[in-house]
Amino acid sequence: MIGCDIVACSRIESIYNRHNTLFLDKFLSKQEQAYIKNTNTIAGFWAIKEAASKALGVGISKECSFFDIIIFKDNKNAPHIKFSTKVMKEFDIKSASVSVAHDGGFAIAVVAIEKN
C-alpha cells in the first residue's frame, strides 16, 4: 500500500507562527518535536503522517490518529516510521518505509506499507 502527501511549507510556517507549540502538540509527540530544526522539518513531518494514513486507506481518523504514526530518525538523520501496536494489528502491517523531500517551497512524502 502506498500513500503520498504534499504540503506548502509556507502554509505550515504560517500555522506554526500563529500557534507555536500548540500546533505541534496536535500531531507530534515530544520525542518527534525534538527532531525539529525549522518549519521545513515540521512540514515534512506533516506530509509523512498524512502519507502514512493515506497508505492505510483511512486518512487521519479514529482508525489511525496522528499519534498512531511514529516518526524517528536514524544515525544518518534519515526519517523512518512505525505504527502503534493497535494499528500494526488492525492493518496487519509487516513493515513501512518513508521518503521525504523538500523543493520549491513544498514538502512531499511517500510511504510504502508491506502487509503480512
Swiss-Prot record:
Give GO BP annotations, semicolon-separated. fatty acid biosynthetic process
Q: What is its EC number?
A: 2.7.8.7
Cofactor(s) in the UniProt record:
Mg(2+)
Pfam families, from UniProt?
ACPS (PF01648)
Under the heading InterPro entries, the entry gives: 4-PPantetheinyl_Trfase_dom, 4-PPantetheinyl_Trfase_dom_sf, ACPS, Ppantetheine-prot_Trfase_dom
Q: Can you state which reaction this protein catalyses? A: apo-[ACP] + CoA = holo-[ACP] + adenosine 3',5'-bisphosphate + H(+)
* Keyword vocabulary terms for this entry: Cytoplasm, Fatty acid biosynthesis, Fatty acid metabolism, Lipid biosynthesis, Lipid metabolism, Magnesium, Metal-binding, Transferase
From the Swiss-Prot or TrEMBL record, state where the protein is found: Cytoplasm
Molecular-function GO terms, alphabetical? holo-[acyl-carrier-protein] synthase activity; magnesium ion binding
S-S pairs: none
Residues reported to bind Mg(2+): 5, 50
* One GO cellular component, as annotated: cytoplasm
Similarity comment text for this entry: Belongs to the P-Pant transferase superfamily. AcpS family.
Instruction: Please give the function described in this protein's UniProt entry.
Output: Transfers the 4'-phosphopantetheine moiety from coenzyme A to a Ser of acyl-carrier-protein.
Name of this chain's protein? Holo-[acyl-carrier-protein] synthase
The lineage is: Bacteria, Pseudomonadati, Campylobacterota, Epsilonproteobacteria, Campylobacterales
State the gene name recorded for this protein.
acpS
